[in-house]
């Protein structure tokens, strides 16, 4: 099932316009407010869409109501014909207007938290990464690639291996401590394409009775499907796998040096289509982070021009360190 998801551009606004939008246009439109705990950050959803409120509650851990938000996302049906995304970076306030796709709600909430971390300078470098991560006996592996290349499919394929546990299928937080990289999950439950069963046969029976949204997706508790041990909150990152699809390159899997990995991540806009602020200063911050990440991990390039099963075998060998 192929469903077209609309693209969006981010309009950066100033604090005055943000205040005017809230006070004069949208304050009376908000029916629900929910705070999420994103690795210790408080991101608040304000919406008039009940379905999104309920999916948010399933998707994220809740935050104590006494904690003031580090960022906010207004998700409102205003009756407009076109979806709009506006962002005010000083207060970390995002507006997602006239959108019917929950994937953008959760991705923009995570993007707001990532923008906060980029501006929060601390002893330990903390950043967010758009990618999947799994744990195998305390050893973490991240799969970072542009959207649509197959990182989510590969992550769920790995979960069928004994002792492999999911940290996240889409987005994670990192903390660089000395020569190590700690990885933290971003979501309580995952928002996934249920047609992943067409790629991984063993999931077909497990996912057949799941209730879907209009985009063929659902927020799913992976533990209920694969058991309580299927997910883990954190791991120590040892391996990074980048995916590419290049029929002119006959090499299917290889280790790469920091310089090639940096070129890959820069050429692919940090493999993150949901970055809210794109300017020279932000680019330098992100490049510096990935340089530190690559210095502390073993980086692999996997070419996805072969079959899903063959790629899964190659990635499995990296994760299991065979």
Describe these PLM feature segments.
Residues 71, 107, 234-238:
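Non-catalytic, well-ordered alpha-helical scaffold segments
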Residues 151:
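Conserved lysine of the Walker
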Residues 78-139:
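Extreme N-terminal, non-catalytic leader segments
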Residues 1-26, 130-146, 160, 164-322:
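Glycine-rich, often acidic-flanked micro-motifs
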Residues 154-155:
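Post-Walker A alpha-helix
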């Amino acid at each position: 099932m192929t469903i077209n998801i609309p693209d969006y551009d981010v309009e950066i606004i100033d604090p005055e316009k943000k205040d005017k939008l809230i006070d004069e246009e949208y304050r009376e439109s908000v029916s629900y407010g929910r705070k999420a705990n994103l690795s210790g950050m408080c991101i608040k959803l304000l919406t008039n869409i009940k379905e999104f409120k309920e999916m948010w509650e399933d998707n994220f851990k809740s935050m104590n109501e006494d904690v003031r938000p580090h960022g906010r996302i207004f998700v409102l049906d205003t009756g407009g014909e076109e979806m709009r995304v506006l962002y005010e970076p000083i207060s970390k306030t995002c507006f997602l207007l006239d959108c019917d796709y929950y994937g953008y709600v959760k991705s923009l909430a995570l993007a707001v938290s990532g923008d906060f971390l980029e501006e929060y300078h601390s002893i330990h470098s903390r950043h967010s990464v758009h990618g999947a991560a799994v744990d195998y006996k305390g050893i973490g592996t991240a799969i970072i690639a542009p959207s649509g290349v197959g990182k989510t499919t590969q992550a769920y394929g790995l979960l069928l291996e004994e002792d492999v546990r999911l940290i996240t299928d889409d987005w994670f937080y990192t903390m660089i401590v000395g020569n190590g990289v700690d990885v933290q999950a971003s979501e309580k439950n995952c928002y996934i394409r249920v047609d992943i069963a067409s790629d991984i046969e063993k999931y077909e029976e497990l996912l057949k009775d799941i209730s879907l949204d209009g985009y063929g997706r659902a927020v799913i508790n992976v533990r209920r499907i694969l058991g309580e041990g299927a997910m883990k909150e954190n791991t120590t990152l040892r391996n990074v796998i980048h995916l590419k699809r290049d029929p002119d390159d006959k090499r299917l899997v290889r280790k790469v040096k920091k310089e090639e990995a940096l070129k890959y991540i820069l050429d692919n806009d940090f493999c993150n289509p949901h970055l809210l602020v794109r300017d020279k200063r932000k680019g330098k911050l992100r490049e510096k982070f990935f340089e530190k990440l690559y210095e502390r991990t073993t980086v692999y390039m996997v070419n996805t021009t072969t079959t899903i099963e063959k790629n899964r075998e190659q990635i499995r060998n990296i994760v299991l360190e065979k």
